[in-house]
Amino acid sequence: MSVQTNLVIKLEEIHKTYHTGEVDVHAVRGVSLEILPGEFVAIMGSSGSGKSTLMNMIGALDRPTSGHYWLDGIDVSTLDRDALADIRNEKIGFVFQGFNLLARTSALENVEMPLLYNHKRIPSHEQHERATHSLELVGLGQRTDHHPNQLSGGQQQRVAIGRALVNRPSLLLADEPTGNLDSQTSIEIMGVFQKLNEQNITIIMVTHELDVARYTKRMVVLRDGKIITDEAVQNRSFAEKELQQLRQAQQAVKLAP
């Protein structure tokens, strides 16, 4: 079975069924989806919609019960656990709600961590260069030696994003990445994602918040394991503009008598 080679993601009639006792739970029901390089897609849905199950399959953390999933032209639907682990490390960068940083390790060393498990055995000097570049991409080029307890929540999430980028993945997969952040810091982090996407980095973001999804370019909504909406984002939000307006408002308050 062939697939378009220019697609980052192609899902074809994906089903996922969990067997719990005498009851079969159909978490994902016949989902088909195509994502091109450089897209910025939000996957939305309420609890029980199937979005988390779909994310796990896109992230090669789980396999579909039936259907096919191609990542960068590779059919990963039937790969064994070891092969899936290689695919995850090489082609997918993960950003989670929790930062999951090593407390006694610098920002640079945290970002270098995925390179230690890269089967290509990247030389140490290149690991250092890649990690430094990743931190520069997320605006932390001057914080490479800082430990997590020396960084704000937003800065820690930037380190986590840098870590996700260091293997130069085909796909950045973010699961509720602003869930632990205050509103202003959330806007700043969405600004980081928007700037990365401007550099043609493909991003899929799983969220239940419409305000977060509006920073993306395309919104896919699930209900009862099926896609019910797949359309371009209307009235898209732009983090840089919102931050500028917020700073102006804060300055006006300071200047008020």
What name fits each language-model region?
Residues 226-251:
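Conserved beta-strand-loop-alpha-helix hinge in the C-terminal portion
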